[in-house]
A protein has these predicted regions:
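N-terminal secretory signal peptides that target proteins for export/translocation
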Residues: 1-23
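Bacterial N-terminal signal peptides
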Residues: 24-38
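Aromatic- and Gly/Pro-enriched helix-to-coil junctions and flexible linker segments
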Residues: 41-223, 338-394, 408, 413-430, ...
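Sequence context surrounding c-type heme c attachment/ligation sites in exported
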Residues: 44-98, 105, 112-118, 361, ...
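Secondary-structure capping and boundary motifs in well-ordered enzyme cores
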Residues: 52, 56, 91-95, 100, ...
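Secretory-pathway/luminal and periplasmic proteins that interact with or process carbohydrate-rich
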Residues: 109-110, 133-137, 168-171, 182-183, ...
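Extended surface/linker regions that mediate inter-domain or inter-protein docking
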Residues: 127, 155, 159, 163-164, ...
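Extended, hydrophobic alpha-helical segments in both membrane/secreted and soluble proteins
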Residues: 408, 412, 424-428, 446, ...
């Protein structure tokens, strides 16, 4: 990093120029962010106000205020003084929308309370619908807008990698992205920027550019070859470490001379002893070192080996992305390439000395014949990545300023994802000229100048129109919105070419591009990011498994559990299947390890594939996924309320209200919990007046899943630890929903969701994907768009790929 020599008396010092340059960009950003978002129109028309006072309010007082009034506010909603100005009071608008929802669903008034007549229900629903529609129309020019959206960590990582072509952990120093209320990490309302964060972006840009843009002669190349004669292992010199079972490792050590930066190539020659009934071995290559008390390696790649023939594989990475030793320190100095067989069937290791290098002939092994290491790998000098930015030109040696301008004119449009103006380019050229005397070489000065590009709002934000009236986004904005939706990264050359020609906004071309993006492997980013955030899959890793209950649990299963749910989404998306498979399905996606966990036979290897499920497995759909069941458990047992809330929130977009303050948990409320079934505990909890109403609406959804334990295994008995042993009781999985529907077990719950709640699920999924696609929360102004998309979705038999295409072609996606 360059250390500037600053002087407060020097108005043209490099840091002064830097501050001036960045201030211009961030001031513009601030002005955009402060565009007025208020409207002089009132949300409630005079006639509407009269109707409310004369017809609506009396019904509320007679049927609703006892539970939603001054003395009691169930679900934290009070109706006797709820504002009727839905435009100016967003919270009131959302509460009225919730009232409309429960009225239409027949959930209110609840059983046991005086019911509304048909005419009374019509008065309420008509008034609320009209008030919401008027508020939407009055605020249409501003509602549903998120002018500024910063790239989140994933988007920044992918964008920097694609822009520079360099493998690096760009997001290493960035703070975590906070999820928005709807659970998404690409929501512009939650993605803020601090001064410290901007410093991290600058440091990251400098670090990356120092690796891409080089100067001076080519560095020396290090080449090593390792054979069976100089194999290392975990504990000392033994030839058995060349045959890799579950515990052995081939360690190729470079003690004295080794590179500390640059691209590397590792070539591994090996054979495999396959055991098809046990699954395939996994060849893992990692690079790092071994200090005295730690093992510090970072994985390069893992490959599933499906052939016993001798073969050679090559692996690539960058040295500086891996842990590096301090020269001359530690018991095991030097850089190490580690080769392992990561296969593990989760069976217990042999006892005693045999567990060091266990002889397990029934398991697959890998035999290493040789390992070659070379770094830095560079076919040309300067490297290709350097030449992509600082390209050959006669201007390079004749007119440095003109050459810099040409470089910026090529680099900035790719970074900003749009055409740039001469003014924008010349501002950076001026910056370069100002700082040039401070740097020994042109390359050094260009690194600093390009770093300024990479911390501009035009790069870090998805900037879209700030006009007071909504308008259709232009072709460049559409290209970015589409690529960040489906790839979580910048548009590629073809997408930008269609934007430049204007063809992208033609419906047939746009549809072709959506299909192309979905068929590209980069769409895995959409599958992974959306599925994780929609289903809250990240919670899986935060659940601590209670080893008293599950002593043999393999932590690698957590990754498999998450991948099952991601792979199911990917399978449904790729083949344009019905999204109702999320609710109930006759198949799932499994690898060998997760199949063994479920007790499903004849599934081998690490690769996930579609597996048909017999009905007695109860696994079909998300509610049979261990990811969902574990993330909504305690790590020792199921958690009925968490599972129920997850169903209501994630599948139906109907989250129950948060519990009132000072309400005890189940365990606190029931001191004799071990002697009670979960249903009995909940019934006792409902005996508390403050808890009864909410739990009547929540608990049944989770009780139906009680046949699944904490880690997603089927059970007929529930075990609880008592002293040094366990006590058991039969599973009770029968419950009655608020509408009187009785459910016994997960199969009846899934059938009910498909037959009676598929419309609610469809609307919920449309809302989630639309919100994710535009990077903002869904608001009342989106109500009409969601209704239209849901109708299309239903008419298309809930086909997921069609839904994505319809969203991209919708007015909501293409306007701002």
């Amino acid at each position: 990093m360059t250390i500037y020599r600053l002087s407060s008396s020097s108005p043209h010092s490099p840091m002064t120029e830097f501050s001036s340059l960045i201030a211009r960009g961030w001031t513009t950003l601030t002005l955009v962010a402060t565009v007025a978002i208020t409207s002089p129109l009132d949300a409630a028309e005079p006639d509407s106000t009269t109707v409310f006072k004369q017809e609506v309010l009396p019904i509320l007082k007679s049927h609703c205020v006892r539970c939603h009034g001054p003395d009691k506010q169930e679900s934290r909603i009070r109706l006797d003084n709820l504002s009727t100005d839905l435009l100016q009071d967003r919270a009131a608008a959302e509460n009225w929308n919730e009232v409309l929802h429960v009225l239409n669903a027949g959930e209110m008034p609840p059983d046991g309370e005086p019911q509304l007549s048909e005419s009374q229900n019509k008065v309420l629903t008509n008034w609320i619908s009209n008030a919401i529609r008027h508020a939407i129309e009055a605020g249409r020019s501003t509602d549903g807008r998120a002018v500024l959206r910063r790239l989140n960590r994933t988007e920044y990582q992918n964008t920097m990698s694609d822009l520079l072509g360099l493998e690096m952990d760009y997001a290493r120093d960035l703070p975590p992205d906070p999820p928005s209320k709807d659970g998404f990490r690409n929501n512009g309302h939650a993605l803020h920027m601090s001064a410290l964060q901007l410093e991290y972006y600058l440091a990251t840009a400098r670090r990356a550019l120092s690796r891409v843009i080089v100067s001076g002669p080519a560095p020396p190349v290090y080449q090593y070859q390792f054979s069976q004669g100089n194999v290392g292992n975990w504990l000392g010199g033994t030839e058995r470490s060349s045959r890799l079972g579950r515990r052995q490792a081939f360690l190729a050590k470079m003690v004295d001379d080794y590179p500390e930066q640059g691209a590397f190539r590792i070539q591994v020659e090996f054979t495999a002893d396959l055991k098809p009934a046990a699954g395939f071995p996994l060849l893992e290559v990692s690079v790092g070192y071994r200090p005295d008390t730690k093992i510090l390696f970072r994985e390069v790649q893992v490959v599933e080996i499906t052939s016993a023939e001798k073969q050679t594989l090559e692996f690539y990475g960058r040295v500086e992305n891996h842990p590096l030793p301090v020269r001359g320190q530690g018991k095991f100095p030097g850089l190490i390439v580690q080769i392992r067989n990561r296969y593990d069937d989760n069976s217990p290791l042999p006892k005693g000395k045999d567990n060091v290098f266990p002889d397990e002939p029934h398991l697959p092994t890998i035999t290493i014949h040789s390992v070659e290491f070379e770094a830095p790998v560079c076919e040309t000098w300067p490297p290709i990545l350097h030449q992509r930015i600082l390209f050959d030109s006669p201007l390079r040696d004749t007119d440095e300023v003109a050459y810099a301008q040409a470089v910026l004119e090529r680099f900035m449009p790719r970074a900003y994802r749009r055409p740039v103006t001469t003014t924008e380019v010349m501002a950076l050229v001026d910056f370069l000229q100002t700082i040039r005397p401070e740097f020994p070489t042109f390359e050094d000065a260009m690194r600093e100048t390009l770093a300024m590009v990479l911390i501009r709002p035009d790069f870090l934000y998805l900037l879209e129109p700030a006009e007071e009236e909504k308008r259709q986004i232009n072709a460049w904005e559409l290209a970015s919105r589409l690529s960040y939706f489906l790839w979580s990264t910048m548009p590629d050359a073809q997408l930008l070419a269609h934007a430049a020609s204007g063809k992208l906004q033609q419906p047939d071309v746009l549809s072709q591009e959506v299909e192309r993006l979905l068929s590209d492997p980069r769409s895995d980013q959409f599958v992974q990011q959306f599925t994780e955030q929609w289903l809250h899959l990240d919670v899986v890793d935060r659940v601590a498994i209670n080893r008293d209950y599950y002593p043999q649990f393999n932590e690698h299963l957590k990754t498999d559990m998450r991948r099952e749910s991601e792979q199911l989404f990917g399978e449904i998306l790729r083949h344009n299947l019905s999204a109702l498979h999320f609710l109930s399905s006759d198949f799932t996606m499994l690898n060998g390890r997760l199949a063994r966990h479920y007790g499903i036979d004849d599934v081998y290897g690490n690769t996930f594939r579609r597996v048909t499920l017999p009905p007695e497995r109860h696994r079909g759909g998300l509610l049979g996924h261990a990811s969902i069941l574990l993330s909504n458990s305690t790590g020792a047992d199921s958690h009925v309320i968490r599972r129920a809330v997850w169903i209501r929130d994630r599948l139906l977009n109907d989250p129950p209200a948060s519990p009132p303050p000072n309400v005890p948990s189940l365990e606190q409320a029931n001191t004799d919990a071990l002697q009670l079934s979960i249903r009995e505990q909940l019934e006792a909890h409902r005996g508390t007046k403050s808890c009864a109403r909410c739990h009547r609406d929540i608990d049944p959804w989770g009780i139906a899943l009680e046949h699944f334990d904490a880690v997603g295994l089927w059970r007929d008995e529930i075990r609880h630890k008592s002293g040094k042993g366990f006590i058991t009781r039969p599973v009770a999985a029968t419950a009655t929903l608020p509408n009187g529907q009785q459910l016994t077990g997960v199969d009846e719950l899934k059938a009910y969701l498909v037959s009676e709640r598929k419309s609610d699920f469809a609307r919920a999924l449309v809302s989630r994907i639309l919100g994710y696609s535009v990077g903002r929360r869904i608001e009342l102004s989106d109500r009409e768009a969601i209704a239209d998309l849901t109708n299309q979705f239903t008419a298309d038999e809930f086909r997921l790929r069609n839904l994505v295409k319809n969203i991209v072609n919708s007015k909501a996606f293409q306007t701002k």
